[in-house]
Curated annotation (Swiss-Prot):
Reactions listed under catalytic activity: (R)-pantoate + beta-alanine + ATP = (R)-pantothenate + AMP + diphosphate + H(+)
Entry GO CC: cytosol
Gene3D superfamilies the UniProt entry points to: HUPs (3.40.50.620), Pantoate-beta-alanine ligase, C-terminal domain (3.30.1300.10)
The species this protein was found in: Enterococcus faecalis (strain ATCC 700802 / V583)
Compartment annotation: Cytoplasm
Pathway(s) where this gene product acts: Cofactor biosynthesis; (R)-pantothenate biosynthesis; (R)-pantothenate from (R)-pantoate and beta-alanine: step 1/1
Record's subunit section: Homodimer.
Name of protein: Pantothenate synthetase
The enzyme's E.C. designation: 6.3.2.1
Binding-site residues for ATP, renumbered to this chain: 30-37, 147-150, 176, 184-187
Primary role: Catalyzes the condensation of pantoate with beta-alanine in an ATP-dependent reaction via a pantoyl-adenylate intermediate.
Amino acid sequence: MVIFKTVNDVRSQVKEWKKQGLKVGLVPTMGYLHEGHESLIRKASKENDKVVVSIFVNPTQFGKNEDLGSYPRDLERDIEVCTRGRATAIFNPEVEEMYCDNASTFVNITGLTEGLCGASRPIHFRGVCTVVSKLFNIIPADRAYFGEKDAQQLAVIKRMVRDLNIDIDVVGCPIIREEDGLAKSSRNTYLSLEERSSATILNKSLTLAKEALNNGERDSLKIIEIISKNINTCNLAKIDYVEVVDSLSLQRVNYIEKSVLVAIAVFIGKTRLIDNFTFELQ
């Protein structure tokens, strides 16, 4: 496992692999890797000759009162996960390597970023798109892998790649869950034992919504009500949003006639967790 710290070094290596006709996969992460990340790395290693995992806590996607300073970091643990997943290399730059002094160029996408997480985190996706576009430029991979837990992020990145004619395939990968249904997340480490137990309310509430949809319910407000009512039975839970949106446009729908994304964001104590599922009409 080789660890690159500079743009020039990782770019040179990837270009050399490409000259040899090798396929390269990229797994962009902020580190503190878990089984969800490992599943992305494993998929990338099966579909490519070489895999680069980027580990970079990107400051431009955090708001003023968010958890940039406390975001968990453990490079040794990350190296172990990358090794198990059969990654070839890690790109672990410092902030100064990724952003020069007085950097003034950012990538901003309208429409898709305005609802869901974008409503309460207004600068988040500008930071995400900027750093991901930089990574795509630094590491000219054939494919990039992202988890479907961050469904809005996945949709936004796919749109950015389409709109900017970036030559890379964006691959979405299924949500990986704990045994009790909680979606794997680096932020789960913030939860106390009581909060961790309460956090299962997210998946339980989505499961109730899924059952209602499978039984024929098509009114989005009814689905939102089912989820919200169940979440509100948990004293430690505070809803940020519960939405039913078109899977492609991420616009709210009133009546479900095609594929929709059912997405939620909930504070358990001070920790903000997200989860979702996609419902496909048969």
